[in-house]
């Protein structure tokens, strides 16, 4: 990467981090003043109302980060993504404030995706060698892109159930995709990864460690970050991009993206499939996600987030091992599919059996979960005071 490009990435990261660190408290005051809060109910895991405009603070960081990078490099390829993020942020905030029909949200997501396809040429038009397939015809590419982008947006939204999970996942995914984009010198995509990490880190600290400064990212933030995650996926596998050269290196781009997206995608598919089997709407909320399972087994929010993210990292490591061992792109895909199912649906089913039978394994897991409650530890208190500015 050229020096000016690298400088632009660093400036964008610092600017996005600093802006969110500054505006977080102000956005929180707005949320409290206008009663934009998430109230406890039978399905929620918090015990008191929590401000829910964290996505707005993150959006400020993303916008300022892009502006800060503009003197150093061309950010025009990211403007369609920014527009899509803005629309989904507005829709999500409206949902947080007054509640929207899931079908209306679904329709908006489809429209936004189609605009990205036709106006910004963002489509899944290449399998990058999976099963020997490269270019995908438009009649297949368009519906495939709609399903993938809308699915990813909703998957990120659905994992937003415990402190730090959706933001922590997006930070992890941004690092993973950022490494890929750095390898192929895709500068605009690297900037998007950098400002995503920079904007999410301050929010993550407040969301996880804060007490008086705790704020949820909300539907606005999770839908917005779903657009970012889907743009990573499209940039990784679409034709004509910098990542095309990865196929020559033996890197399975479809397996890689699926590995990074493992927990949101596989867990969402499992949950929706089970809802359909129970003859309920796939969009009907319940408490059957992986993070609900860890909470039920006695883990803290922080412990739950770390465990769920660890499961995702394990799948990425399985993919990396298969690549390093020289596996073909097809074999890499099968490794990701098998490990993804095992570490999500398989793990969920295994622990459900342990809970039903009250086994020794369950008692050990519960004992481990109890150790994740560290709110009384000095280091936790120090972090809490630091983020609350006490």
Model regions and ranges:
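A generic, lipid-embedded transmembrane alpha helix
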Residues: 51-67, 114-119
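Short aromatic-rich membrane-water interface segments that cap or initiate transmembrane helices
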Residues: 45-51, 131-142, 250-257
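Transmembrane alpha-helix boundary signature
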Residues: 64-76, 94-100, 117-131, 237-243
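Alpha-helical transmembrane segments
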Residues: 2-30, 35, 59-87, 166-297, ...
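Juxtamembrane helix-capping/reentrant segments at transmembrane boundaries
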Residues: 39-53, 214
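Membrane-embedded alpha-helical core segments of multi-pass
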Residues: 86-91, 108-123, 144-154, 170-176, ...
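Membrane-interfacial loop-to-helix junctions in multi-pass inner-membrane proteins
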Residues: 98-108, 140
